[in-house]
């Protein structure tokens, strides 16, 4: 009689192809043979659903009842007393909803897991020895990235606040770190909202305040600054160029190799200069960019050189 490992190999082969119909047929045969599925079996079948959706989407085909399949498989897993859902399970579920541009469903799933975790432990959050694993910080980051894709920074901000709340309740593994805040700043940058520059810079200053209060896990880095630069650049308006120039001067003045402006920083500065109205002396601004590069021996690439030359021709 085939072992659970053999069945899992078959399921994996169908999952790679995204062949959900054959995977489900294999699943039914497996259960009829009285072989108990393990967590690998469940995760593989769920992953097959995700792969199937991606393939159908790429080929512009109807996704059919894949949502129903995913929910049924997960529900069956949660009722299986012999199998414990793990973080791969959670990630697969979250990926599925984000791929379908249903970030709200991904967030609801994540918060439901937290609720069920507390319920299984009589209202107490436990790091170990729990019937339902508590989600990792990276899963929250994944959902926040979903909000980035759908250009809803306010929702990402609420999720970060939820992480802080859970961390304050004793689950230190969810304390927001630099990556968490950078994702949030990037959410504002990609939102193209008129207020995105102001909001992004406020978050940057908030990170600095947390570091001053002893929260070293949220120290700002070059990405933090570059996302703020992008947010200001996408905000538009006369103040955007002023804020970008000030931030780049700040990056240089910190004398921190991990914060010094890079190609992305200068390209955003040049992009904003090029988009500025006629009252800006673009040739003079181009010279200021070159002078700033010289202060920290930055060697511009070909693209940056061309953009500086284009300012001279404008």
Predicted ranges, named:
Residues 3-8, 12, 23, 38-43, ...:
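Pentatricopeptide repeat
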Residues 8-19, 28-32, 43-63, 75-79, ...:
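Tandem alpha-helical RNA-recognition repeat domains
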Residues 26, 66-69, 73, 109, ...:
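Alpha-helical solenoid repeat scaffolds, predominantly canonical TPR units
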Residues 34, 81-82, 117, 132, ...:
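Inter-helix linker motif
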């Amino acid at each position: 009689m085939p072992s659970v490992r053999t069945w899992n190999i078959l399921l994996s082969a169908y999952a790679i192809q995204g062949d959900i119909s054959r995977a489900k047929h294999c699943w039914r045969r497996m259960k009829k043979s009285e072989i108990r599925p393990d967590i690998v079996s469940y995760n593989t079948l769920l992953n097959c659903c995700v792969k199937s959706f991606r393939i159908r989407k790429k080929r512009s085909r109807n996704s059919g009842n894949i949502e129903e399949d995913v929910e049924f498989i997960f529900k069956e897993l949660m009722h299986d007393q012999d199998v414990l859902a793990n973080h791969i399970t959670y990630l697969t579920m979250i990926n599925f909803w984000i791929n379908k541009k249903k970030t709200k469903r991904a967030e609801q799933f994540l918060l439901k897991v937290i609720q069920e975790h507390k319920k299984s432990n009589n209202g107490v959050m436990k790091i170990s020895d729990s019937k339902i694993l508590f989600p990792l910080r990276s899963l929250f980051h994944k959902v926040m990235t979903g909000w980035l894709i759908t250009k809803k920074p306010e929702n990402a901000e609420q999720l970060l606040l939820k992480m802080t709340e859970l961390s304050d309740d004793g689950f230190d593994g969810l304390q927001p770190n630099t990556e968490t805040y950078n994702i949030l700043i990037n959410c504002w940058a990609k939102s193209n909202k008129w207020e995105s520059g102001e909001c992004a810079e406020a978050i940057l200053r908030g990170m600095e305040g947390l570091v001053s209060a002893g929260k070293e896990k949220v120290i700002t880095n070059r990405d933090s600054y570059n996302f703020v630069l992008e947010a200001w650049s996408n905000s538009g308006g006369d103040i955007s160029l002023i804020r970008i120039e000030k931030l780049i001067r700040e990056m240089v003045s910190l004398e921190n190799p991990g914060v010094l402006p890079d190609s992305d920083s200068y390209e955003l500065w040049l992009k904003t200069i090029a988009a500025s109205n006629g009252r800006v002396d673009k040739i003079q601004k181009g010279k200021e960019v070159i002078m700033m590069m010289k202060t920290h021996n930055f060697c511009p690439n070909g693209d940056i050189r061309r953009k500086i030359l284009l300012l001279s021709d404008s």
